[in-house]
Structure formats: structure tokens, C-alpha cells
Amino acid sequence: MLYRKPITVCLASCSVQETHGSACDVSSIAYDSRAVREGSVFFALRGTHAHGAQYIHAAIDAGACAIVHDCPLDTYVVGVYYARVPDARCALSSAAAAFYDFPTRALTVIGVTGTEGKSSTVSFIAQLLRLCGKRVGFISTVEYSLGDDILPNAEHQTTPESLTVQRLLAEMREHSCEFAVIEASSHGLSTRTARLQDVAFDVAVCMNVRHEHLEFHGSFEQYRFDKANVFRALDAHDHIKDGRRVPSFGVLWAEDASAVYFREATHKPCFFFKRGTGAEQRTAACLERMPCTLLWVQTLPQISQALRLRFVLSTVQEPAQPAQDGAHDVSVPLEGAFNACNIAASFLVLHGLLGTSLAAFAQHVQYVQPIQGRMQRVDMGQDFEVLIDYAHTPSSFEEILPPLAARVRARKRRMLVLFGSAGERDTQKRAMQGAIASRYAHVIVLTDEDPRGEDPMGILCMIAAGCEHKKLGKTLFLIPDRVAALRHIFSLARAQDLVLLLGKGHEHSIIYAHTVQPYDEERTARELLRASLSSDTLLS
């Protein structure tokens, strides 16, 4: 669909401080001068390494008829409309929403935040809504959908810029979607980026809050505050979508230390999930506001490769007398006990929006599929196990490594782990990652993740500082080249060992200072294993 709007309509909700030139109609919006075409409005955004004001003349040469900026300009080109605003990023979000006719006014929007589990939970919610017969689109780190096909997300951004968010939401509306599920990162929820500023959220989900992204937020408190913006957003509008009122609520993990903080960020009701059998006494402080809905989730002994869970749904009227809906067992074709919380949160979203019962949910959830790069098995016929996972934080290491290590110990074999840490990101977590991996892995291979502008070997040395009791060249290897690192860890693996490839997951590139190298972890692993098996066959 083609859009065209007067620039004054796009900027109607922005605090325009001054203008130069005559207003015009715009046919597209751009914040990258290379994307400008005839009739575009160009937003000059402040970036990490440069300011968009440097590219205003390039944008005009490419056909921009309007410029939105937040800094003083020395010259103004005749025939071009200029609008100065306090913050060009905030203005971009508002203008994009207006340009695309406010798409979230027609969509029931579910925002999923948290340090771990966002992408999987977004995917599970979208899959389950579809299994209930609903038209749904979604945006996540791994992939996105406008209602039909699922497409890979080629960017390294969890939440895209506001212009992309509004465009994708508009396309979901055009594809007759009723629901949109958005992975809401702390960056995207920050007022500094304003990427989700003009999204009318109806449901907010927070999986957990752990140590991450302090290089951007500056402190854990600011990190938590920014994440809670998705809960504050629930109180910002009336939840009337295309003339119908939709339910609005929050979903929280009762055991998380920040659950009370997030519950108090909204006046809307919150549903909770908690690990246990349902027989335990209520202990979570977040449950003090009653009545409240509480879902107990218990992990049952695994059969084959399916995750088996027992759910008990309670309505807590008072601490001693919760009303329970009986126990329901479900089987989900997923790896990893951590997915229990992701599935529990997904149920509460469906329960709150559609009134889905546990019995109906049990019928649907057996068809849920894992997403790429999350506990993904690679089997080329080798005699050892290979798993790929996106885990790249200390908390995600603590979540996945202990149960895998226990599984390996039970068969008296070894766990070999390959990972790195992103450059120009939180440096405090690097030694922590090394220390956690050292506790559970027999062999560690450190390699590039996304070094960006940092020295790759310098990053690996910072991780290695936490790898106590590992001997360099014996049980600890520093190999920046990721392909070479994979080749080496496969060469070390013995029969029945477990090889974990962490950090890249679904991503399709490695970012260096001056280049972006195409890279696919699954494809690379398959090619190396295939070559190794062919070589072994020839030698035998």
C-alpha cells in the first residue's frame, strides 16, 4: 500500500520549535540518507559515531523535500521544508505512527520483555494464537511475520527502529491480522531510542530481569526502569481497537526479584506463573495484591525429547485458600527445562485474551515448534551430540549449563563449550561467563561473537580471566576465528560427548570493526561435521 501525507500531519503531535520553508506532502520517511527517494522526509538522528545532520545535503540531493532535525543548522536550502524538534528520534516515532495511520489502533498488541526467553515466548504466543484460529503477526530477534510467511530477521537489533516497527505493524493490519506480538528489548523501550514509543500495548509480559546491557543503560536500576515502560504503556490508552474493547493485563514470573516492581508499574491486573506443584505456601511478595491469578508449573521427568509439564491454575483470594483448577499435564516438543516458563507465560496470555482453558491449551501446545538457534540439535551422523543456543549472558549460562552438565555426568562423558562475548557491550559479564562455564564444562573454546571495534583477542582474554582451573592449551583454547574454533572443538569431541555452541544462535553474521562477515552457525557446523565424517570414511 502506498502512503502520502502532509508533513504537518506527520508532525502534528511533535513539539515543533521552528520551521523554514513551505510545508509539503511526503511519500516516504527515512533516517538513512541512502534510503531517501523523491518526496521523502529525512530525520537527522544522533548516532553512536555520527550525527545525521552530516547527511542532510546528501538526503536533499537524493530527493528529500523535508528535513526534521534537533540541532542548529547553518544553512537552509530553498524549496525544502525544515522542522526543528527537541528530539528527532521521538519525532520519528510519532511521525511514523501518523504516516502509517496508527496501526496499533487496529491490533491487539502483546509486548514481551525480559533478559532471557523473549524470542521463544514471542514465537510460542504467536504459534498458539494461530493454533486457536487467529490471524497474528510478530516481530522478534530471530524472525518476523506479517500474518502468513515467517521470515528471518537479518538485523542484529531485537527491536527495530520505530519507522520499521510502524511499517511492519501497518503491513500486519493490511494482512488482516488481529494480534501483533512484539519482542520489546530494553533498548527499544528506552526513551533514548523511542522505538516503541507510539505502540499502543494491550498486554505486557516480563519473563525475568537479570544483569545485561549496562553499557547502554548505565545501571541496573535504569535497565529495569526502561523495561518496565511496557507495563506503564498499558495505562496510556483506552484499549479500544477497531471499536472493540480488548483485555489489558500484565504477565509476570512470581519468583523474579523485580516482579513487585513491574506489578506496581501498571494499574492493570497482573497474572503470575511460578515453579512448583501448587501445594506450597504463598511466599512471593508480588502476590499480595489479591485476588490474583497464579499458574503453577512443574517439570516432569522427560520422555524422549519432549518437555513434560504439569500446570495448576489458581485464583488466590487469600493466602491460605487458593481456588485451584486441578492439574493438567502437557507435552511440548522442546528441549530445555527453561522453556517451562516460556510456555507458562504463553498460556497466561491466551487465558487472559481468549479465556483459553488448560484443557484446550494442552491440545494446542503439543504442536508448538522450537525456533532457530535455541537448543537446536545438529546431527550429521557424528558419534557426539551438538547443540546450538543463543545463550550469551551469565544468567542464560546458569539456566542451561547445569541440567546439561548433569545429563553428561550421568552417562560419564564430557561437555565441551564454545562461546565468546560481544564487543562494545557490557564488559562486566565477560569474566562471569568464563567462571560459570568453567564450573560445568570440561573443555572451553573461546572465540569471536561480535567483536565490533574491540580487539578480538582482548575480549577472549577478559573471558579467560574467569576460567579458573582451566589449563591453556589443554582444557582452555582461545581461537578468535569462529570457523577454526568450531573445527577445533569438533576435533576434541569423543563418542557420547556434548558439544555446545553458544552465543550466535540464529544470527547470520559476525560484526568486526570495519566489516560484517557472513556467518551461519548451523550451516558451518553441518559443513564441518560432514567434512570430518567424509575424511574419517576415507581413512577407514
Swiss-Prot record:
InterPro entries: Mur-like_cat_sf, Mur_ligase_C, Mur_ligase_C_dom_sf, Mur_ligase_cen, Mur_ligase_N, MurE/MurF_N, UDP-N-AcMur-Glu-dNH2Pim_ligase
Post-translational modification, as annotated: Carboxylation is probably crucial for Mg(2+) binding and, consequently, for the gamma-phosphate positioning of ATP.
Molecular function as annotated in GO: acid-amino acid ligase activity; ATP binding; magnesium ion binding
Family label: Belongs to the MurCDEF family. MurE subfamily.
Entry annotated with the keyword ATP-binding: yes
Gene Ontology CC annotations of this record: cytoplasm
UniProt source species: Treponema pallidum (strain Nichols)
Modified-residue entries (N6-carboxylysine), positions: 227
Compartment annotation: Cytoplasm
Residues holding UDP-N-acetyl-alpha-D-muramoyl-L-alanyl-D-glutamate: 33, 158-159, 185, 195
Enzyme class: ligase
Keyword list, A-Z: ATP-binding, Cell cycle, Cell division, Cell shape, Cell wall biogenesis/degradation, Cytoplasm, Ligase, Nucleotide-binding, Peptidoglycan synthesis
Name used for this protein in its record: UDP-N-acetylmuramyl-tripeptide synthetase
Binding-site positions, ATP: 114-120
EC number in record: 6.3.2.-
Pfam families, per database record: Mur_ligase, Mur_ligase_C, Mur_ligase_M
GO terms classed as biological process: cell division; cell wall organization; peptidoglycan biosynthetic process; regulation of cell shape
Entry superkingdom: Bacteria
Listed pathway(s): Cell wall biogenesis; peptidoglycan biosynthesis
